[in-house]
């Protein structure tokens, strides 16, 4: 149902305010929540029934309409259901709305059940509902310069697609919640994963400041260091060559220098010079370590030093990474655009990059970590008396273990 008048909006708001479960979705002009505008909102409170509320491009009018639904979004008594809810929460944040109450994210629910599979709505609809959804490409066309924006379409063209999103998500929720096999799985979902969603949304919304001048200095530092390495590599090889070319690297290392007897080749007959292979032969000649170091610097330069300034949001002056909750099978978070969890921490090159991240004015960065958390969990689960005693007494667990093994006093362990 298309809700395109103020009177219809008032009616649907009253219905939503009395609903215990609300499936919701936002339609926007892009996939980056911090850079897009809302085109509309869809809601479903029972299967096979949904509503779509268009949101105009004029900012003041858009804020007015979205604000009318504030009591719905901020009603702590209703369960909010969505697919990839972090995105919708972020979009609504940019309109001054905080989503309150318990959450049920179908993407995260399926991740808990089948972490190694895909979790997109189209895939889940096919698997669980035997239903093929309307694909976004059918509305705006395939990716490319000619692709339309959702803003280019009339509400009449969008509302069936948008209503389907909210309806399918509600249907998936009704199936997936029954898939939680035991209380431990339920607790993991409701007590850990779901409360984490708005936390990650706030982290992404806050973003982090970047010191452009520090990056410029780092760029000069990395470029200078790479040139020095190049000269060292050329001197060892006895000739200049393109270090970025796997073909030329292979020819220099294995044809000219013959640093190993057994070489590996690809199906096309080219020498293998992948990072894994070069690491495995690093001790055969100093030039290999130099080439690996050069590659590492080039990667850091391209991934962070040169890329970070381009990822600064012009509206906030910060970079806003995306924290991915449903990627790793182990439950660990990952991040992308940019990947802020993969910056080297122990070497000088990593420190050079990290100094470009700065706190807000009047604030400080605070770094905290659990002390030996894995071993503490092992002690708790195993109820091992020796481990528990070591932790309770404040001793170093490794020193206590060594003392036990060698039957000496812990004070003698060095």
What function would you assign to each model-found segment?
Residues 79-89, 113:
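Acidic, metal-coordinating catalytic cores used for nucleic-acid/nucleotide bond scission
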Residues 98-114, 394-398:
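Conserved beta-strand -> loop -> alpha-helix junction used to position metal-binding or nucleic-acid-contacting
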Residues 67, 123, 351, 375-376, ...:
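Feature representing long, continuous alpha-helical segments
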Residues 393-414:
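Generic long, charged, amphipathic alpha-helical segments
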Residues 160-161, 388-395:
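Active-site metal-coordination segments of metallo-dependent hydrolases
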Residues 87-94, 252, 377:
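Phosphate- and divalent-cation-binding pockets in alpha/beta enzyme and binding domains
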Residues 1-57, 74, 83-85, 100, ...:
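Conserved "right-hand" nucleotidyltransferase catalytic core of DNA-directed polymerases
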């Amino acid at each position: 149902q298309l809700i395109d008048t103020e009177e219809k909006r008032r009616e649907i708001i009253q219905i939503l305010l009395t609903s215990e479960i609300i499936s919701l979705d936002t339609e926007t002009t892009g996939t980056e929540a911090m850079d897009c505008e809302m085109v509309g909102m869809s809601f479903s409170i029972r299967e096979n029934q949904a509503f779509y509320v268009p949101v105009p491009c004029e900012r003041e009018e858009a804020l007015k309409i979205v604000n009318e639904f504030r009591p719905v979004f901020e009603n702590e008594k209703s369960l909010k259901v969505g697919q990839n809810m972090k995105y919708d929460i972020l979009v609504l944040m940019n309109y001054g709305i905080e989503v309150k109450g318990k959450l049920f994210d179908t993407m995260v629910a399926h991740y808990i059940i089948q972490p190694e599979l895909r979790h997109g709505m189209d895939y889940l609809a096919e698997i669980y509902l035997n239903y093929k959804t309307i694909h976004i490409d059918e509305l705006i066309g395939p990716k490319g310069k000619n692709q339309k924006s959702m803003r280019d379409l009339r509400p009449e063209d969008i509302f069936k697609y948008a209503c389907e999103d909210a309806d399918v998500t509600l249907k998936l929720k009704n199936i997936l919640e029954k898939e939680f096999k035991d209380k431990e799985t339920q607790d993991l979902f409701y007590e850990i994963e779901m409360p984490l969603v708005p936390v990650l949304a706030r982290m992404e919304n806050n973003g982090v400041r970047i010191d452009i001048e520090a990056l410029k200095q780092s760029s000069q530092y990395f470029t200078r260091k790479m040139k020095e390495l190049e000269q060292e590599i050329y001197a060892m090889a006895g000739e200049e060559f393109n270090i970025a070319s796997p073909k030329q690297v292979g020819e220099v290392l294995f044809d000219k220098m013959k640093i190993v007897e057994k070489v590996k080749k690809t199906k096309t007959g080219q020498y293998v010079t992948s990072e894994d292979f070069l690491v495995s032969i690093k001790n055969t000649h100093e030039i290999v370590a130099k080439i690996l170091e050069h590659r590492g610097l080039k990667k850091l330069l391209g991934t962070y030093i040169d890329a970070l300034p381009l990822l600064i949001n012009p509206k906030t002056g910060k970079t806003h990474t995306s924290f991915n909750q449903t990627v790793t099978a182990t439950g660990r978070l990952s991040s992308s655009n940019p990947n802020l969890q993969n910056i080297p921490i122990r070497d000088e090159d990593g420190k050079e990059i990290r100094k470009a991240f700065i706190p807000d004015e009047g604030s400080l960065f605070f770094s905290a970590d659990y002390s030996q958390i894995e071993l503490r969990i092992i002690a708790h689960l195993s109820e091992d008396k020796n481990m528990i005693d070591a932790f309770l007494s404040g001793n170093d667990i490794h020193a206590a273990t060594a003392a036990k093994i060698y039957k000496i006093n812990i004070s003698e362990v060095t």
